[in-house]
């Protein structure tokens, strides 16, 4: 019996890890990866950090260059797909080539959510999703240049830190009343706001751009009436899933390809993962997790589902952010206002805990990354704690 052919569409973390997971889980059939980027699949997190700060930055590949050939995975880089061929099971490229598939994994990622008022500036305006974006930003982030960043989420704040470290004059504009409002708890939001302000970043909350004039400098008029002059304008206000191919194939989409817990779409032969995917939960709600670890997890889950193997258990959601000399790691449930703090954030060393009826459901570490491993185990097991003991620095966490 002829082994099936699996095609992976995409060139990022989820795509590369899907290939690795399929081989690790025993798939020996024909395996192809198609990407519109010319690079081998590379890590995205460094784009807003080391790729802007290091003297001679190099892309960090997800898998070693020799892995692909050694594992008999056919790479098709720098190609554009015309259609997925859902009905014919023939993926078609714009150059006319067609490739048969039995199962398909879509990991086309996402683009920056557009902001038409700024997009009209053309090359004067920047977003950050790919290596080319980082290279262009690196060229313009020069000392003493005025940089305006729209959006104070994770990417916006990481860019603010990197631009400040490159000795730029940075202003951040945020529509909400706080920074990192979607994915950090209130005490961490307050810490980050203060941290950036102490570094010289001007952060304007509850504000937005109303008018833009392009000249020698970009003139930005805010809702507050203030006018800013910028040499460089960057925005990061969310993502727009690269779902066009899936939409044209009549797959269910909702700013993302809708998948179930097995990463399966409405077509049982087509799977999706990473930033392009959005999961329908048991209660019918749609949930997207935009993180490096989620891309890895969904790649492993999809590979298992494709091969008819038991699905791996999902660990608590986890991501990290490096800003200035700080490493923050977020794990578990970030919702809720009643967080406990172990340590002193003013010394840039602390852990915030989220207890619900004594059960640890989430945590954020500040320059305490070594503690994430036991915290992950505690969250997974539903461990209960005495709050006073948890925040007592005289008691080692590992002894609890």
Swiss-Prot record:
<comment type="subunit">
    <text>This dioxygenase system consists of four proteins: the two subunits of the hydroxylase component (HcaE and HcaF), a ferredoxin (HcaC) and a ferredoxin reductase (HcaD).</text>
</comment>
<keyword id="KW-0274">FAD</keyword>
<dbReference type="InterPro" id="IPR050446">
    <property type="entry name" value="FAD-oxidoreductase/Apoptosis"/>
</dbReference>
<dbReference type="GO" id="GO:0005737">
    <property type="term" value="C:cytoplasm"/>
</dbReference>
<protein>
    <recommendedName>
        <fullName>3-phenylpropionate/cinnamic acid dioxygenase ferredoxin--NAD(+) reductase component</fullName>
        <ecNumber>1.18.1.3</ecNumber>
    </recommendedName>
</protein>
<dbReference type="Pfam" id="PF07992">
    <property type="entry name" value="Pyr_redox_2"/>
</dbReference>
<dbReference type="GO" id="GO:0019380">
    <property type="term" value="P:3-phenylpropionate catabolic process"/>
</dbReference>
<dbReference type="GO" id="GO:0008695">
    <property type="term" value="F:3-phenylpropionate dioxygenase activity"/>
</dbReference>
<dbReference type="Pfam" id="PF14759">
    <property type="entry name" value="Reductase_C"/>
</dbReference>
<dbReference type="GO" id="GO:0009334">
    <property type="term" value="C:3-phenylpropionate dioxygenase complex"/>
</dbReference>
<keyword id="KW-0058">Aromatic hydrocarbons catabolism</keyword>
<keyword id="KW-0285">Flavoprotein</keyword>
<dbReference type="GO" id="GO:0008860">
    <property type="term" value="F:ferredoxin-NAD+ reductase activity"/>
</dbReference>
<dbReference type="InterPro" id="IPR023753">
    <property type="entry name" value="FAD/NAD-binding_dom"/>
</dbReference>
<dbReference type="GO" id="GO:0016651">
    <property type="term" value="F:oxidoreductase activity, acting on NAD(P)H"/>
</dbReference>
<keyword id="KW-0560">Oxidoreductase</keyword>
<comment type="function">
    <text>Part of the multicomponent 3-phenylpropionate dioxygenase, that converts 3-phenylpropionic acid (PP) and cinnamic acid (CI) into 3-phenylpropionate-dihydrodiol (PP-dihydrodiol) and cinnamic acid-dihydrodiol (CI-dihydrodiol), respectively.</text>
</comment>
<dbReference type="InterPro" id="IPR028202">
    <property type="entry name" value="Reductase_C"/>
</dbReference>
<dbReference type="InterPro" id="IPR023744">
    <property type="entry name" value="HcaD"/>
</dbReference>
<feature type="binding site">
    <location>
        <begin position="146"/>
        <end position="174"/>
    </location>
    <ligand>
        <name>NAD(+)</name>
    </ligand>
</feature>
<comment type="similarity">
    <text>Belongs to the bacterial ring-hydroxylating dioxygenase ferredoxin reductase family.</text>
</comment>
<keyword id="KW-0520">NAD</keyword>
<comment type="pathway">
    <text>Aromatic compound metabolism; 3-phenylpropanoate degradation.</text>
</comment>
<dbReference type="InterPro" id="IPR016156">
    <property type="entry name" value="FAD/NAD-linked_Rdtase_dimer_sf"/>
</dbReference>
<dbReference type="InterPro" id="IPR053382">
    <property type="entry name" value="Ring-hydroxylating_dioxygenase"/>
</dbReference>
<feature type="binding site">
    <location>
        <begin position="5"/>
        <end position="36"/>
    </location>
    <ligand>
        <name>FAD</name>
    </ligand>
</feature>
<dbReference type="InterPro" id="IPR036188">
    <property type="entry name" value="FAD/NAD-bd_sf"/>
</dbReference>
């Amino acid at each position: 019996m002829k082994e099936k052919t699996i095609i992976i569409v995409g060139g990022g973390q989820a795509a590369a890890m899907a290939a690795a997971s399929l081989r690790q889980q025993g798939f020996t059939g024909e395996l192809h990866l198609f990407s519109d980027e010319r690079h081998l699949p590379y890590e995205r997190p460094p784009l807003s950090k080391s790729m802007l700060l290091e003297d001679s930055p190099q892309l960090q590949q997800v898998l070693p260059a020799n892995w692909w050939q050694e594992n008999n995975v056919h790479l098709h880089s720098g190609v554009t797909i015309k259609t997925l061929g859902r009905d014919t099971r023939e993926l078609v490229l714009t150059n006319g080539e067609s490739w048969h598939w039995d199962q398909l994994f879509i990991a086309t990622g996402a683009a920056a959510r557009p902001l038409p008022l700024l997009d009209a500036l053309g090359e004067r305006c920047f977003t950050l999703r790919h290596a080319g974006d980082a290279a262009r930003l690196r060229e313009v982030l020069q000392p003493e240049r005025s940089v305006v960043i729209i959006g104070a989420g994770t990417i916006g704040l990481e860019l603010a830190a990197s631009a400040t470290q490159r000795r730029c004059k940075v202003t951040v504009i945020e529509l909400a009343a706080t920074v990192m409002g979607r994915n950090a708890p209130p005490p961490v939001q307050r810490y980050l706001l203060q941290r950036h302000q102490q570094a010289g970043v001007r952060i304007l909350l509850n504000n937005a751009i109303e008018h833009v004039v392009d000249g020698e400098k970009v003139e930005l008029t805010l809702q507050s009436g203030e006018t800013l002059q910028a040499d460089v304008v960057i925005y990061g206000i969310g993502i727009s899933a690269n779902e066009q191919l899936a939409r044209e194939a009549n797959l269910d989409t909702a700013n993302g390809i809708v998948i179930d817990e097995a990463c399966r779409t409405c077509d049982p032969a087509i799977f999706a993962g990473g930033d392009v995917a959005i999961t329908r939960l048991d209660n019918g709600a749609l949930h997207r997790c935009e993180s490096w670890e989620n891309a890895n997890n969904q790649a492993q889950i999809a590979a298992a589902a494709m091969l008819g193997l038991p699905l791996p258990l999902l660990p608590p959601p986890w991501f990290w952010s490096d800003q200035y000399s700080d490493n923050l790691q977020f794990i578990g449930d970030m919702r809720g206002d009643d967080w406990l703090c172990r340590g002193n954030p003013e010394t840039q060393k602390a852990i915030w805990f989220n207890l619900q009826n004594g059960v640890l459901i989430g945590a954020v570490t500040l320059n305490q990354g070594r503690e994430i491993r036991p915290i992950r185990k505690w969250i997974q097991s539903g461990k209960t704690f005495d709050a006073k003991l948890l925040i007592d620095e005289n008691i080692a966490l590992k002894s609890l």
